[in-house]
């Protein structure tokens, strides 16, 4: 594998892993290469992202590397997030949002377990729309990100606090979480909790 191919593989892994990032050890295991080789390629790739003409950077958080946007470009991303708040959410995003709203703080993997499918794209959508955010790190291997709702979530759904969320049925069946998410949003609509936009 050439250096460019190695860097392309690292870049792809960072992209796929998203906010959780990937540790150097995980990269070495995935790529089946030594720490020295992977770290040198990663550092050179990270240096290439420091170019002013790039919108992304590679950062290290809690011993995990991840792709993130450059802070100086935040005003553009905020405009984008605010404009996309007006458009509808997919069924997957609605399910994910309902799970996070009721079970926060919660990791992506825990959301995946409840839904029975991967939720990374839905979480990225909800994060970009400022409806959820990172609220901490779980204990344990990799210290996964914990997600919770934001003040924008409360505002968007006309809630003063999370205590105003409609109660879920006590006999909730996790295998039918899509139906439960529909029930959640129907209850919110019936209670006139949605803003008319």
UniProtKB/Swiss-Prot annotation:
Participates in chromosomal partition during cell division. May act via the formation of a condensin-like complex containing Smc and ScpA that pull DNA away from mid-cell into both cell halves. It comes from Halalkalibacterium halodurans (strain ATCC BAA-125 / DSM 18197 / FERM 7344 / JCM 9153 / C-125) (Bacillus halodurans). This is Segregation and condensation protein B. SUPFAM superfamilies: Winged helix' DNA-binding domain (SSF46785). Homodimer. Homodimerization may be required to stabilize the binding of ScpA to the Smc head domains. Component of a cohesin-like complex composed of ScpA, ScpB and the Smc homodimer, in which ScpA and ScpB bind to the head domain of Smc. The presence of the three proteins is required for the association of the complex with DNA. One of its GO terms (biological process) is cell division. It is found in: Cytoplasm. Disulfide bonds: none annotated. The gene is scpB. GO terms for cellular component: cytoplasm. PANTHER family: SEGREGATION AND CONDENSATION PROTEIN B (PTHR34298:SF2). Its main location: cytoplasm. Belongs to the ScpB family. Keywords: Cell cycle, Cell division, Chromosome partition, Cytoplasm. Signal peptide: none annotated. The keyword Membrane does not apply. Coiled coil: none annotated.
């Amino acid at each position: 594998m050439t250096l460019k191919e190695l860097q392309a593989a690292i870049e792809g892994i960072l992209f796929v892993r998203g906010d959780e990032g990937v540790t150097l050890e995980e990269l070495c295991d995935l790529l089946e290469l030594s720490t020295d080789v992977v770290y040198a390629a990663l550092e050179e790739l990270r240096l290439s992202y420091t170019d002013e003409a790039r919108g992304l950077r590679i950062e290290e958080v809690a011993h995990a590397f991840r792709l993130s946007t450059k802070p100086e470009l935040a005003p553009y991303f905020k405009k984008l997030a605010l404009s996309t708040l007006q458009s509808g959410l997919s069924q997957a995003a609605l399910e994910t949002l309902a799970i996070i709203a009721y079970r926060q703080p919660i990791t992506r993997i825990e959301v995946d377990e409840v839904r029975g499918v991967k939720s990374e794209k839905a979480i990225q959508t909800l994060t970009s729309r400022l409806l959820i955010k990172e609220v901490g790190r779980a204990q344990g291997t990799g210290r996964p990100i914990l997600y919770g709702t934001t003040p924008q979530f409360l505002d968007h759904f006309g809630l003063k606090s999370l205590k105003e969320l409609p109660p879920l049925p006590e006999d909730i069946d996790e295998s039918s979480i899509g139906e439960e998410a529909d029930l959640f949003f129907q209850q919110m609509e019936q209670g006139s909790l949605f803003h008319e936009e």
